[in-house]
Amino acid sequence: MKIAIVGGPTAVGKTDIMIEVCEEIGAEIISMDSRQIYRYMDIGTAKPTSEQRRRVPHHMIDIIDPDEYYNAFMYRKDSLRAMEDVLRRGKIPVYVGGTGLYADALVRGIFEGVPADENIRKELRELERREPGILRKMLEEFDPEAATRIHPNDLKRTIRALEVYMKTGRRISELQKEAKGDDRFFIIVLTRERYELYERINKRVDKMIEMGLVDEVKRLLGMGYSKDLNSMKTIGYREVIDYLEGKYDFDKMVHLIKRNTRHFARRQIIWFKRYKEAVWYNLTFEDVGEVKEKLKKLIVENFSV
């Protein structure tokens, strides 16, 4: 038995295509999106509509509040529990989403995280504040392999890697290698040519604005959720917050959301290219109807193995 993970960049059309595919084969969708896990954040995360969720049951959406902590290890545990529930009911589970880190957690495994230590994190943040760039140098010295995989500007993951090293004396890159992979999964990636994908992203952002993204952000802030939360730094939310604070005008806000989403989509494609065994479908060149038929066949046949 092989379970499909259908990934790809934002706005490529995963949701619409997979709703139809899963409806016809009697499958249920397990969301693989690190932002759709949050309640109250609907428009900016492009959650499936209530009508779509009626057509095909979805899991791993709206599971925590915006101020709650969540990580890839927790996602793996919770989503596998959801998968087993779907299997017990005689249905086909299909993972759908664009969060590559979650795909990694499923396929390659993830070590059981070392508990967070706020004292260490506070010390590291203060060190970085006093001497910008010092944490990057420390990471390159203590864990060169992790340094090659963590972007120089990704302070959060840099601090986490150093925290693990300081608490255990072991490199996070070594611990991650000890994690057990799971051969029950196979990966399908939906993509489009850059010009078409970027056009779709621009249109999606315009639609989000029309649907009330600004009001959604205002409502979240009104509920007491801080702009400094990880959830509120999601693309679309952070730009609206800066707009509401008067840092730039409305048109600049829209421009930045589009630009940042395009950059994010490019990073997603790069991430999924790491899966050498993945099956790719380029929706710019392939007929979408034919791709849907191929997906149905591929998902069902692999599930029946």
UniProtKB/Swiss-Prot annotation:
InterPro entries: Dimethylallyltransferase, IPT, P-loop_NTPase. ATP binds at residues 8-15. HAMAP family: IPP_trans. The keyword Metal-binding does not apply. Residues 33-36 are annotated as: Interaction with substrate tRNA. GO terms for biological process: tRNA modification. Substrate binds at residues 10-15. Catalyzes the transfer of a dimethylallyl group onto the adenine at position 37 in tRNAs that read codons beginning with uridine, leading to the formation of N6-(dimethylallyl)adenosine (i(6)A). It comes from Thermotoga petrophila (strain ATCC BAA-488 / DSM 13995 / JCM 10881 / RKU-1). Monomer. The record marks 99, 121 as: Interaction with substrate tRNA. It catalyses: adenosine(37) in tRNA + dimethylallyl diphosphate = N(6)-dimethylallyladenosine(37) in tRNA + diphosphate. Its EC number is 2.5.1.75. One of its GO terms (molecular function) is ATP binding. Pfam families: IPPT. This is tRNA dimethylallyltransferase. Keywords: ATP-binding, Magnesium, Nucleotide-binding, Transferase, tRNA processing. Belongs to the IPP transferase family. Its cofactor is Mg(2+).
